[in-house]
Design a protein with these regions (language model features):
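Conserved beta-strand signature within the Rossmann-like core of class I S-adenosyl-L-methionine
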Residues: 129-140
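Short conserved loop adjoining the S-adenosyl-L-methionine
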Residues: 97-102
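Short alpha-helix
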Residues: 157-172, 176
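Conserved class I S-adenosyl-L-methionine
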Residues: 1-36, 40-48
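Conserved Class I S-adenosyl-L-methionine
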Residues: 176-239
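A short, conserved alpha-helix within the catalytic core of class I
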Residues: 114-127
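Class I SAM-dependent methyltransferase SAM/SAH-binding core
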Residues: 51-86, 91-94
């Protein structure tokens, strides 16, 4: 798994200094649910290239970003230097082996497979006084990937958000939750879209031959570019 995320790092979304429209809505909802980051210690589990980590670093007192991918962390540290962010600690580790021996003001994790099961979720709960967790509410729709899934079930989808929500109910842990939706288009060159599709298909256990993928995408390309429509539904848990 580490190798897959290392491979993705070069083309993964990076911190630009400003949150996207979707992320602004996410942060507004987190604030509405009572979490404040000002002057707080934060840990970001599965931080990737630091899109959230670096934004929060500009608000909080200190933040630790943990990820299994050294290449992802390298990108995050490059962007931290670019934006003069110095209150950041990067830790390369999987979540099961991450043992900071402290409790943070806020434990934060968005769209990361690092928190994989109930044992991990309990560990996540114990990491923070407040916790913010975001995961898929249902499988993401991609107009490009649908060309290759051909109606097959995506075995990689894990309904963790609803499972963890039920855990909070069982344990009588008060929480707020909501579903956030996003619809967008992504335009890439034929080669970029080919490599992106191959990565997503491989991680979903739908491996396809590279030339076949490129040929299929060539048939829908316009002037050397392919436009992908993406529809996402995510569940936010704040507690």
């Amino acid at each position: 798994m580490k190798e897959m995320w290392d491979k993705k790092a070069a083309s993964y979304t990076r911190f630009t200094g400003e949150p996207s429209v979707f992320h602004r809505g996410l942060y507004a909802k987190i604030t509405e649910f009572g979490v404040k980051f000002e002057n707080k210690s934060v840990v970001d589990i599965g931080c990737g290239t630091g899109v959230h980590t670096l934004f929060l670093a500009q608000i909080c007192r200190e933040i630790t970003g943990i990820d299994i991918s050294g290449e992802m962390l390298k990108v995050m540290l490059e962007d931290a230097a670019k934006f003069n962010i110095s209150n950041l600690t990067a830790v390369q580790s999987d979540f099961k082996n991450f043992n900071p021996n402290r409790v943070y003001d806020v434990a934060f994790s968005t769209m990361s497979p690092a928190i994989a099961d109930e044992e991990d979720f309990v560990k996540f709960i114990n990491l923070g006084e407040k916790r913010v967790y975001l995961w898929w509410n249902k499988p993401r729709y991609s107009s490009v990937l649908e060309l290759f899934y051909e109606g097959s079930q995506r075995g990689c989808f894990k309904e963790k958000a609803n499972f963890f929500e039920e855990y909070l109910r069982r344990e009588n842990i008060a929480f707020n939750s909501c579903v956030l939706e996003e619809s967008r288009e992504q335009k890439r060159t034929l080669e970029e879209m080919t490599q992106n599709a191959l990565w997503h298909l491989e991680i979903a256990n739908f491996t396809h031959e590279e030339n076949a993928v490129r040929s299929r995408l060539q048939s829908i390309a316009q002037d050397g570019y392919v436009t992908e429509k993406i529809v996402s539904s995510m569940k936010l848990l704040v507690f």
